[in-house]
């Protein structure tokens, strides 16, 4: 199982790196083209985020249809998705939608850390 866990960890870290790069690119684009960053575009992004959360909720409901997974409940995953959505919105310079103050799945921070230490992969 260690191999499978490592694959999941790498996948999460890879997606985190992609997200951080896209946010940096977006912020640079807006900095260089401030006229595009208007209230209409900001509302579109916020509405798109809310719609994505609706779809995520439907997926989580389906995934947890038969009950929770040891150590996780559907409600925690939904709150985590909202927590991350708020983080991404603020990284884009937008207001939070959900106001989830504390990470409901704090162990995910360790998984999403983007820089692997060499000794972690040699065991």
Model-predicted regions and their roles:
Residues 15, 56, 120:
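Acidic-residue sensor for enzyme active/binding pockets
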Residues 1-11, 16-29:
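Active-site-proximal binding-pocket segments
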Residues 10, 25-116:
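C-terminal, helix-dominated tail/subdomain
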Residues 115-123:
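Single conserved hydrophobic/aromatic residue that forms the stacking wall/gate
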